[in-house]
Amino acid sequence: MSQGDDDKIPENVLLASLDDMINWGRANSLWPMFFGLSCCFVEMMTSFTSRYDVSRFGAEVLRGTPRESDLMVIAGTVFKKMAPSILRLYDQMAEPKWVISMGSCANSGGMYDVYSVVQGVNQILPVDLYIPGCPPRPESFLEGLMLLQQKIRSEERPTRPVLRMQGGTQGTVAPILVDGATKSRDTRGPGMEGIAIRGSAMQPPYFAAPRSDELWRPKQPRLPYPDFNLQAELQGAFAGQVVLDETACDMLTYRAPARLVPELLRHLKERKESPFRRLEDIACVDESCRRDREKYKDFTVNYHLTCFDTPGRIRIKTELEGSYPEAPSITSVFPVANWYEREAYDMFGIRFAGHPNLRRILMPPDWDGHPLRKEHPARATELPPYTAEDARRQKALPAGDFFDRVDDETLILNLGPQHPGTHGVIRFVLKLSGEEIVDMDSDIGYHHRAAEKTGERQNWHQYIPYTDRVDYLSGVQNNLAYLNSVETLCGIEIPDRAIYIRVMLCELFRIANHLVWLGTFASDLGAMTPVFYTFTDREKIFDIVEFITGGRMHPAWFRIGGVAEDLPEGWQEKVHSFLEWFPGRLAEYEKLLSGNPIFVARLKGVSAITVDTALEWGITGPNLRACDFAWDLRKKMPYGGYDRFEFEVATAQGGDCYARYQVRMEEMRQSLSIVRQAAAGMPGGRFISPDYRYTLPQKRDALEDIESLIHHFVNSTRGISPPKGECYAPIEGSKGEYGYFAVSDGLHTAYRMRIRTATFPHIQSLPVLSRGWLVSDFLAILGSLDFVLSDLDR
């Protein structure tokens, strides 16, 4: 058509190039895969709900398989154990295809320069677009989607490839980058190569003569704890070989030789009065870098047990010698010890004689070394660059190797490590007879990002943001779990106002966690409606959280000794508005689901367990209370000021999937009551402790008082130095009991930071919960536990 003929074109005719037409269709009809790695995926999924409504951009239909998808959003941390699966998914996607890297961890490794994390997905995949943030907000994801659409429309020339001709461009054309060659090897950015990274007593570079020892500080305060009338009893039963550790300050502690540990634990478990019925954790410590090395053997193994009749805990310590020592397994006493012993073997190289299947649990089967030993590198940048070739060479354990080979005509079914029903990266291997589950096992560690090793590298204040990302659906509860141990170790008194602020925010996050659980759990069972409403209510909570803290999922707002800042003006109105809004919504959810015969039939009687079984397998929190066992740390062993609030412990009968649902519904109601009490009774005064040996001073104090200014400078640069000692003081988290075993050698970083999470034993218990039920029941059983993979793998 010649120029000047435009006026001859009818109004209902549009002229465009074939490139433009193809790009228009593709840009406005993207097919993202249902695929998520970490925290960023939650914010990505939030963009699909009603407040943000991604359907406006033609990308709302998530595809369950890679063969139906053309957009992969790498939402979260890229783990080395997961990298081979990511590559396989990408290779199976339809052409043309595009990749969005969402969040700092996917972009560059972010704050996780750790041995288990790939320092940017661009080392194994080509990337079209990077979205910054940790995690990015839903609005950021929507902007990234629009920018990708713009890129497709303006930069691609797909006609020739579509017509099977040479030339043209479509899909991702960016190169895969090589760490240290085409991208910076240093996480601090270009130009930093050769400049030493600050270290600690355990990690290079070493600093001579730490000044921490020149500062006077009191010893770790001794807490009042029950002695359970054990000393004479153990003296008689073990002929003086079990010795009271009089240096322990946080709980009753005894030392015993390794050979006696199984017998000792059985004695404690089966005693008539005040038995210790549950093993909480096994926490190992590599003692090779202690400053007073002569006082320690090579390794210490700590067994934490709980008594319910007389609420309290006991720690049993045993010392081991040698580079790769051995201790007797206690799986015959406490079945839950199975995974804890495997973890100790995986991370420390400690063997357990008599263990039924001692193999790695978090790291890939071919991993070299044991990451929590002091000599193992902490940083990814201390290891050789990770490439796509490394990922392709790495092989997962074959499904058939999880069970004894028996010719019984059973079927092995892989579920994961990428499946919409697992809500993250985990692999379940089911052994089926027809559709009945006769056995199962779990392959975990796909979300392991070295949270414990990082605790030995960051100073005590710097570590707070890392705690946010352990149970990334529970926000500031993570901070409180960590600070409860650190503040107990230091003997810090928390101001009343800070106590109330903490409790109010923790209970808001408990509701937020349960809302995500409720919506996704109902969705797993086929009820699509609730998730869109529960996320709307969660956004109302996040409006409050963001107004007070400035953050959403990861506020990192609690501080040692209090909180980061005082409450802003106007907080009461926002909290009151939610308190008025939510009870009616909760009643609607209950009416919608509890009155739904299909929902009830899918859950009632399914996966029922007794209290004894729950305690044997270390089950805590709502899943334990669903067995009609009223154990809640906020009531039974109060911490953080919870003894100032009136609330009921939510329980249910039956121990089945439906009872777990009932407990969480009632917990939201009780949390609402606690928030109401905290808001109404909010005291005045300071928001952080004036004990500036351990806290960051309020700004006004640092500006007016030279002593406070000095403390601010020291504590914000080098970091605080708690007294030598150790403390384990768990909290009642959203998913169950959650605590940090903090070990201090008197320096500005923790010597050992062990994290006990609720999800770890809960997922271990799945074979007990699932045997005899159908494949169709499995996702209901799994979802009823309320788990998150970062909580599992740490």
Swiss-Prot record:
Catalytic activity: a quinone + NADH + 5 H(+)(in) = a quinol + NAD(+) + 4 H(+)(out)
Record flagged with keyword Endoplasmic reticulum: no
Gene Ontology CC terms: plasma membrane
Subcellular compartments: Cell inner membrane
HAMAP family: NDH1_NuoB, NDH1_NuoC, NDH1_NuoD
General function of this protein: NDH-1 shuttles electrons from NADH, via FMN and iron-sulfur (Fe-S) centers, to quinones in the respiratory chain. The immediate electron acceptor for the enzyme in this species is believed to be ubiquinone. Couples the redox reaction to proton translocation (for every two electrons transferred, four hydrogen ions are translocated across the cytoplasmic membrane), and thus conserves the redox energy in a proton gradient.
Subunit structure: NDH-1 is composed of about 13 different subunits. Subunits NuoBCD, E, F, and G constitute the peripheral sector of the complex.
Protein's name according to its UniProt entry: NADH-quinone oxidoreductase subunit B/C/D
Organism: Citrifermentans bemidjiense (strain ATCC BAA-1014 / DSM 16622 / JCM 12645 / Bem)
Gene of this entry: nuoBCD
